[in-house]
Regions:
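N-terminal and secondary-structure boundary signal
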Residues: 1-168
Length: 168
């Protein structure tokens, strides 16, 4: 595996987010999903619509999320949509709960433990995914960020339970 290029900025604004996106040199094409964590109701651990809105609109993106596997305000589609509304994400884009109508398995390549991930069926509807993640400490894994957002973040409720149980 080659070395990754990492882009950093001290300026955290909608404009700096667009600058970093443009620096990648890979324009979003087709149906664009923007994977974020919409956060738990009453919490503050999510990227705010005011920060990501300009980028999401620029790429004509749909925010994509999956329901959680634990108790909270995102463990059912109905509750999740209410949380999304209260956090203001419907004000900037369409939102798709990608496991709302079921899930399917995708293989994990070059694996050590899990043979597959279980993701929402709507994930098939997207040609291009932009992953926007906040960096945080996580009670179970120690750290959370882009890789977690792209693996367990696109996993359906069943997929999240599968991953957290180490595939058992």
């Amino acid at each position: 595996m080659g070395k990754s290029t990492v882009y950093m900025t001290k300026e955290i604004t909608p404009e700096s987010l667009i600058k970093i996106y443009e620096k990648l040199g890979k324009p979003a094409t087709g149906r664009v999903g923007v994977k974020i964590s919409t956060g738990e109701l009453g919490g503050h651990n999510y990227l705010k619509p005011e920060l990501i809105g300009k980028l999401v609109k620029m790429v004509n993106g749909t925010i994509i999320e999956c329901n959680t596997a634990y108790e909270g305000s995102r463990n059912t589609t109905e509750a999740h949509k209410d949380t999304i509304r209260q956090h203001g994400f419907y004000d900037i884009a369409q939102v798709d709960i990608v496991d709302e109508e079921g899930d399917f398995q995708i293989p994990v390549r070059d694996r050590k433990h899990l043979q597959y991930d279980i993701v929402g069926t709507h994930l098939k509807n997207y040609d291009f995914i932009i992953n926007l993640a906040h960096f945080k400490g996580h009670l179970m894994a120690g750290l959370g960020g882009v890789l977690k957002n792209q693996s367990i973040g696109v996993a359906s409720s069943a997929g999240k339970a599968y991953i957290h149980s180490a595939g058992i």
